[in-house]
A protein has these predicted regions:
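Conserved N-terminal helical subregion
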Residues: 4, 46-178, 220-232, 373-374
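A structural signal for isolated positions on well-ordered beta-strands in alpha/beta enzyme cores
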Residues: 5, 28, 212-214
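Conserved mid-domain beta->alpha element of the FAD-binding
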Residues: 7-22, 26-33, 148-149, 175, ...
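Conserved N-terminal glycine-rich FAD pyrophosphate-binding loop of Rossmann-like flavoproteins
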Residues: 34-51
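Short, flexible helix/strand-to-coil boundary loops that buttress conserved ligand/catalytic motifs
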Residues: 40, 56-57, 64, 83-84, ...
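Conserved FAD/dinucleotide-binding core of flavoprotein oxidoreductases
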Residues: 81-105, 138-140, 180-257
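C-terminal domain-closing interface element
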Residues: 341-360
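C-terminal auxiliary extensions adjacent to catalytic cores
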Residues: 355-374
């Protein structure tokens, strides 16, 4: 393989580039923005994906903090469950981490170095015998043996493979934010979620004196014409004290809007010499806590297949055969998870009772599935 073109400099594209460079395979990333991802958000990366980053030499401790405990509060703010994520993660080889997305993006970008081209916006792709071609907004073009689309849920490259396909929007929206202080009420290395009918909220320790928090409504898209904080105050009752503390520490321009949309059962993920990975192929809800992990797992597997010396058709076919079931399962689980955490009073009562009385073996299996990606 003489050259791999990557469209998109997000987590998937950067991880793939580092993985290929480690194998000595030439790569170039074209990222449409002329800066690193500049909105301060964060996410949880489970143990199996952290191991991939660590194997690439990524110092994850510089961009986040290990997660030890995940605490869930159900109806009326009552505590219902604590999951010892840290101990279960370490049983499988690495901690799970709460990560500052901006810091991780900046770190990975610097590790990739000059092979990342910023301000290079792909507007179309094509494929000829033995080559994939990308055309850019400034009229220039680039070509490689293969082209890998890592350009996210609103992928431009997807139009080449599946013209007219759009995200399935779920009618859910909210905000996520990172604040430059640690809340006294939040224990170190802990994430808390608060589940109410029609809305869930969460807060997590990012380390380095930072906290991420988020709110997601089940059947409501936030209005741009109304105060963000007022929309939360008016629709989340009772408002958890932890979330109130977050609101008090956050300017509204720090609250990044989110909407839930996904792509289930899209197939194939490739055409000729062009392949999609990450959210370009299998976008999932931002409230699932699994999208970044799936992208990292995609990148690691694809790099191994490219390095194996197989033919391009075999690489693409084998990649989809291995990853599609897992990716579709993540999407289905994210839908179920949003429904579970925001269900109505009666179902919420049943849910809370089940979590409070769940056998330890069952709880451990749930945690094991999360930290291993199964």
């Amino acid at each position: 393989m003489k050259k791999v073109l990557i469209i998109g400099g997000g987590i998937a594209g950067l991880t793939l580039a580092l993985s290929l460079k480690k194998l000595g395979i030439p790569v170039v990333i074209h990222e449409k923005y002329n800066h690193y991802q500049n909105q301060k958000t964060g996410f949880l990366i489970w143990s199996y994906a952290i191991k991939i980053l660590q194997d690439l030499g990524v110092p994850v401790d510089e961009v986040g903090a290990p997660l030890e405990a995940f605490r869930i509060h159900g109806r009326k703010g009552r505590f219902i469950c604590e999951m010892p994520i840290g101990s279960v993660s370490r049983l499988h080889g690495a901690n799970s981490y709460e990560i500052n997305r901006y810091r991780l993006s900046e770190l990975l970008s610097k590790m990739v170095g000059d092979d990342l081209l910023l301000g290079s916006e792909c507007i179309s792709v094509s494929s000829i015998e033995g080559q994939a071609i990308a055309t850019f907004a400034d009229g220039s073009s680039d070509q490689g043996d293969i082209l890998i689309a890592c350009d996210g849920s609103n992928s431009v490259v997807r139009k080449f493979i599946h013209p007219g396909v759009q995200l399935r929007m779920l009618g859910s929206g909210g905000w996520i934010s990172v604040i430059d202080q640690r809340l006294p009420l939040l224990p170190l290395n802990t994430q808390m979620e608060f589940w109410q009918p029609g809305v869930k909220a969460g807060v997590a320790d990012l380390g380095h004196g930072e906290t991420r928090w988020y709110v997601a409504f089940k059947n409501y898209i936030p209005s741009a014409d109304e105060s963000k904080k007022d929309q939360i105050l008016n629709r989340m009752k009772p408002l958890p004290e932890m979330i109130m503390s977050c609101l008090e520490c956050t300017d509204e321009d720090q609250m990044v809007p989110t909407q839930a949309g996904d792509l289930l059962a899209l197939s194939p993920w490739y055409r000729d010499r062009v392949l999609m990975i990450g959210d370009a192929a299998h976008a999932t809800s931002p409230y699932a806590g699994m999208g970044a992990c799936s992208a990292i797992a995609d990148a690691a597997l694809l790099a191994d297949l490219i390095g194996s010396g197989r033919s391009v058709p075999a690489i693409f076919q084998d990649f989809q055969a291995v990853r599609k079931h897992a990716a579709d399962s993540v999407i289905k689980e994210s839908r179920r998870g949003l429904d579970l955490s925001t269900c109505g009073e009666l179902k919420g009562w049943v849910r809370d009772w089940m979590f409070m009385n769940m056998p330890e073996k069952k709880l451990n299996q749930i945690m094991t599935d999360m930290v291993t990606g199964h």
